[in-house]
Amino acid sequence: NPLPESLTPEEQKYIIGTQANLWGEYVQTADYLEYMAYPRLMAMAEVQWTDAEKKDVNNFHKRLKTQFAWLDKKGVHACRNFYEAEFGGAWNNTQNVYEVKLKTLCPDAEIRYALDCADESRFKTYSAPIALDKETELWAAVYVDGKRMGGITHKRFAVNKATGCEYTCSPKAAWENMHEGYALTDG
């Protein structure tokens, strides 16, 4: 909402719209400018022109799929992160494994993945968290109607004896840049 609730109605009347910036120092080509601008400008238009009570991010994501087809038809070099698999996960204390969860913003899409293999022909359909008990590399991609829509996303998971363990430093570390008690684990 371009009119924050923290402002009074008197203050809100001075807001006449929204603004999207694209800093051009590192934009060397028109293709890269398009990549940086789309579909971000579509999201900006959604924020500006859709009434607050009608805003629905899931509906926007469904409509964005058709907008990509329109951008392709027009030859616009749009960013395809919408079609990338995202990695998440957490340690499962019950099974002593790290469970990787995959998701995508794209509705009605299928995620396919492979462990320790970038060969797309060996990808399996993702349906449940992936249990890892050792260091593993994972590749994943998003498919719509059997067609890969974005790039292949890759992540290395360093699962080892220390993963998921509670640990302390003894004696307590004294260096100033230590972040929340994290330090090198020996073993």
What are these regions (language model features)?
Residues 1-99:
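Flexible, acidic glycine-rich loops studded with aromatic residues
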Residues 55-186:
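Short, compositionally stereotyped local motifs that mark structural "simplifiers"
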